[in-house]
Amino acid sequence: MGGSMSILTRDEILKRIRAGQIRIEPFSEVQVGPASIDLHLGNDFRVFKEIRHPFDVTEHADLDKITEQIHIPDGDSLMLMPGKTCLGITVEHIKLPPNVCGWLQGRSRFARLGLVIHATASFIQPGIDNRQVLEITNNGQVPLNMIPKVAICQLILQECVGQATYSGRFRTQAFP
């Protein structure tokens, strides 16, 4: 059986960023907590169209058929009604080496409002080179304004046993 997988702490995260092993753009050291990195909500979203017919869940499902892409300028917001979901994306572009994976976690201050930042896709594969799409759902009781540039979630980094690189269709995603 292999060794353990360790969560990277602040000092280790900063060391690896300074060495160029992990890249986050844009980046400021104030984003790094004891064992996570704050990521910010970008300006681009996908909102779901009001559709009355069922949509087939398949490997090649085309979100363009049921969503529309919108851009929210800085200083503006997207209102997310209770029970509704949208796709957002991080401001930060993240590049991980083949021996580091990650996890996205919502922030507790927003969870208390009923805001879910990722529906089920919180795992970030080693070797990714992209911005992270967020499956954002308002499970609360009141409409919530999604404001670009807010520190919306945290990235937790973990060292992998061995090396691997994700090469799937979302490896270099730039839009939700």
Language model segments and positions:
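DUTPase catalytic domain/fold
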Residues: 1-176
